[in-house]
A protein has these predicted regions:
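Acyl-donor (CoA/ACP) binding surface of acyl/acetyltransferases
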Residues: 1-20, 24-31, 62-145
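Conserved GNAT-fold acetyl-CoA-binding loop/helix
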Residues: 31-53
Length: 145
């Protein structure tokens, strides 16, 4: 568990999260499909289960984001290269939870975790062209764009 603030907590991804993740994606499918290419391929909870089980077998740590004890999204490392001490951070947040500073605080805390606990030297964040809300996060955190 990584405590981000009094209201925001990151929990390691587990199989117990499958239905929360699927239900959020399914309920917000129209909104999320614009930026998350996997949404249309996620048709059943089994698709989410396959993803979660795959991630749990990799070196890429992923976390659920809880805001005021409610699941609101995912954040985690992707394409981690421990030998060269570099990783990428990816994230998504439920539409209703946006605009509250949840993601920028979560990304900042995950960066701190990557440099401090995981001994990373380089972190990348890739953002879809046109996704200005997502782009503002690495910009505000001082990433080179």
């Amino acid at each position: 568990m990584i405590e981000v603030s009094e209201d925001i907590v990151l929990y390691p991804l587990s199989v117990d999260d499958i239905f929360k993740i699927f239900n959020t994606l399914n309920n917000e499918r129209e909104y999320m499909r614009e930026w998350l290419p996997f949404v249309d391929a996620t048709k059943e909870a089994e698709d989410t289960e396959n993803y979660v089980r795959y991630v749990l077998q990799t070196a890429d740590k992923q976390f659920t984001i809880y805001y005021k004890d409610q699941f609101v999204g995912l954040i985690g490392f992707k394409d981690t290269d421990s030998d060269n001490k570099k990783t990428e951070i990816g994230y998504w947040l439920s539409q209703y939870a946006q605009g509250k500073g949840i993601m920028i605080q979560s990304v900042a805390k995950l960066i701190e975790h990557a440099f401090g606990e995981l001994d990373m030297n380089r972190i990348q964040i890739k953002v879809a062209v046109g996704n200005d809300k997502s782009r503002r996060i690495p910009e505000k955190l001082g990433f080179q764009m």
